[in-house]
Amino acid sequence: MERFGYTPAASLSVPVIPGLTIASIPLSQLDDVRRMNRDIFSEERVINSFEKEDLMILEARLDGEPVGFKVGYRESKKVFYSAKGGVVADQRRNGIALALLDDMMRRVEEKGYHVFAFDTFPNLHPGMTILAMENGFRLVKADYNAVYKEFRLRFERRTQAPF
């Protein structure tokens, strides 16, 4: 894949954010994630199902207050899929989304996955498209999602997990 310019990248350039902690949380502690999901996306559903292999739920807190989340799971033997994530409105553009992405990617790499993937809707969430392009992700697919009535982009990036 390197011959196509698709090389694994080192850790993302995440700024130091004083007071920020990111932790993996169990399904039993989803209340804050559900609340943030409603506030950010105006919908109850976080993801279609939590019955996924290698389910990972990360919660970001700033000075103890929940400010963001990221949810992902195994898509295939080599691919980990980040299904959803978000940052509360008053904390956007502070590096929290990048910190969540970096944290999840490091955990995924430690589990041995070779590819980290996510989909985004550029007309709804243009920041994720920019974040992907600025951090070594490759656009690998574009299609139309009839549920959201929007175009969807698929981004992937290789991890440094050994083959």
Q: Where do the language-model regions lie?
A:
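Conserved acetyl-CoA-binding loop-helix of GNAT-fold acetyltransferases
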Residues: V87, R93-R106, E134
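Acetyl-CoA-dependent GNAT
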Residues: S24-V79, A83, V88
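C-terminal "cap" of GNAT-fold acetyltransferases
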Residues: R3-A9, Y144-F163
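Conserved beta-strand-loop-alpha-helix junction that forms the acyl-donor binding cleft
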Residues: F118-T129, A146-V147
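Conserved GNAT acetyl-CoA-binding A-motif
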Residues: V108-F121
